[in-house]
Curated annotation (Swiss-Prot):
Record-linked SUPFAM superfamilies: L35p-like (SSF143034)
Gene Ontology MF terms: structural constituent of ribosome
Recorded family membership: Belongs to the bacterial ribosomal protein bL35 family.
Any one GO CC term of the record: cytosolic large ribosomal subunit
Protein name from the UniProt record: Large ribosomal subunit protein bL35
Originating organism: Vibrio cholerae serotype O1 (strain ATCC 39315 / El Tor Inaba N16961)
HAMAP family, sorted: Ribosomal_bL35
Length: 64
């Protein structure tokens, strides 16, 4: 039986850790002048994926 393939887009965006699957927040790349300092600071740390999304990401990353 052939090996299953990872979804390459998901592999670049998500990382499996002991605490769950972590990812970076969206809307933090460019045109940040309209965002407040508080909002940019809150988007800084990596986030942990919520439970409702775990199954979808697990399907995309079979070996994670």
């Amino acid at each position: 039986m052939p090996k299953m393939k990872n979804n390459k887009g998901a592999a670049k965006r998500f990382k499996k850790t002991a605490g769950g699957i972590k990812y970076k927040h969206a809307t933090k790349r460019h045109i940040l002048t309209k965002r407040t300092t508080k909002n940019k600071r809150q988007l800084r740390p990596n986030a942990i994926l919520p439970k409702c999304e775990l199954a979808a990401v697990a399907r995309m990353l079979p070996y994670a």
